[in-house]
Amino acid sequence: MLEFPLINDTSRKIIHIDMDAFFAQVEMRDDPSLKDKPVIIGNDPRKTGGRGVVSTCNYEARKYGVHSAMSSKEAYERCPNAVFISGNYSHYREVGMQIREIFKCYTDLVEPMSIDEAYLDVTTNKLGIKSAVKVAKLIQYDIWQELHLTCSAGVSYNKFIAKLASDFQKPAGLTVVLPEEAQEFLKKLPIAKFHGVGKKSVERLHDMDIYTGADLLKISEITLIDRFGRFGFDLFRKARGISNSPVKPNRVRKSIGSERTYGKLLYNEDDIKAELTKNAKRVAESAQKAKKVGRIIVIKVRYSDFSTLTKRMTLDKSTQDFDTIDRISHSIFDQLEENSSGVRLLGVTLTGLEDQEGRQLDLDNLA
């Protein structure tokens, strides 16, 4: 078997900025009466007959076990005193662009991963600041002073560890992992916290008695590749803190979609939803093959009179999981106004795409 040298570039200074419960935080900033209340971004199930899904929620709501992609009905059952807000996504995008302008004051090497998070390479920066920690603190300060929003920051020598670090002390946290500290940091981390390891994969790793980074470190590269395919190669390196992926500004935003036109109009709701599921499956399979994950799910419905409706849902975390795409596509469809005319076309699209590296995915799809 070919073996490649483990080249680890520790000279870079990478920051990962992740806004804290961004959509909910913007709503709380704009409406001070929401302070200290559980806030859920999603349709109120009391107004939709139980339909709807949670886009995100604030930390107060998370205390009740509410999380993104949960049905609004279950969220209400867990937290009946929550304030449900349908969400103003165009406003969130505007605020997201304001945040990016702050990033650009420090470096042009900014790689947005979504509307509320980005990687920054500040190895060399516009202000000539040698300390990446100081840059991260200044960015946190600027975002608070200008926008009255908090973010968490991770600072390290690569994107993988910087992302893990930004999740370590939320909200409004700053975690620094130096090259000489990376191995101990990763050893203590539960394997489920490694970005790129989905729930099913965690189960498979647990079956191998791999529960932490320290456990993963003991497994040979050959064993990991044999069990997980190409991704085993990446796991072996990440366990050692090796990830030389560059910060890529101006990343091309693409979408993955599937739509079908029906010669025979669809009238029956069961038939329509069965076709939605087929589209969702094709999208998930295409995303997994392309090694992409997305945060926005869009459905498109064209009726017999050629009128067309599109509706989208933005998730708190990116996905390529079929069950998630299927469930949310159905939830979005349920929110459309009833139309008795037949359906001529159905489409499902996953957009807001990014590379699966550093994100949640299912290793079963890579074996």
Swiss-Prot record:
UniProt keyword terms in alphabetical order: Cytoplasm, DNA damage, DNA repair, DNA replication, DNA-binding, DNA-directed DNA polymerase, Magnesium, Metal-binding, Mutator protein, Nucleotidyltransferase, Transferase
Role according to the record: Poorly processive, error-prone DNA polymerase involved in untargeted mutagenesis. Copies undamaged DNA at stalled replication forks, which arise in vivo from mismatched or misaligned primer ends. These misaligned primers can be extended by PolIV. Exhibits no 3'-5' exonuclease (proofreading) activity. May be involved in translesional synthesis, in conjunction with the beta clamp from PolIII.
Cellular localization per UniProt: Cytoplasm
Note accompanying the cofactor annotation: Binds 2 magnesium ions per subunit.
Binding site for Mg(2+): 18, 116
Cited NCBIfam families: PRK02406.1
Record-linked CDD domains: PolY_Pol_IV_kappa
InterPro entries, sorted: DNA/RNA_pol_sf, DNA_pol_Y-fam_lit_finger_sf, DNA_pol_Y-fam_little_finger, DNA_polymerase-Y, DNApol_IV, PolY_HhH_motif, Rev_trsase/Diguanyl_cyclase, UmuC
Organism: Streptococcus thermophilus (strain ATCC BAA-250 / LMG 18311)
EC number: 2.7.7.7
Name of the protein described by the UniProt record: DNA polymerase IV
Any one of the GO BP annotations: DNA-templated DNA replication
Reactions mediated catalytically: DNA(n) + a 2'-deoxyribonucleoside 5'-triphosphate = DNA(n+1) + diphosphate
Cofactor: Mg(2+)
The organism's taxonomic lineage, starting at the top: Bacteria, Bacillati, Bacillota, Bacilli, Lactobacillales
A GO-annotated cellular component: cytosol
Subunit structure, interactors included: Monomer.
SUPFAM superfamilies: DNA/RNA polymerases (SSF56672), Lesion bypass DNA polymerase (Y-family), little finger domain (SSF100879)
Stated family: Belongs to the DNA polymerase type-Y family.
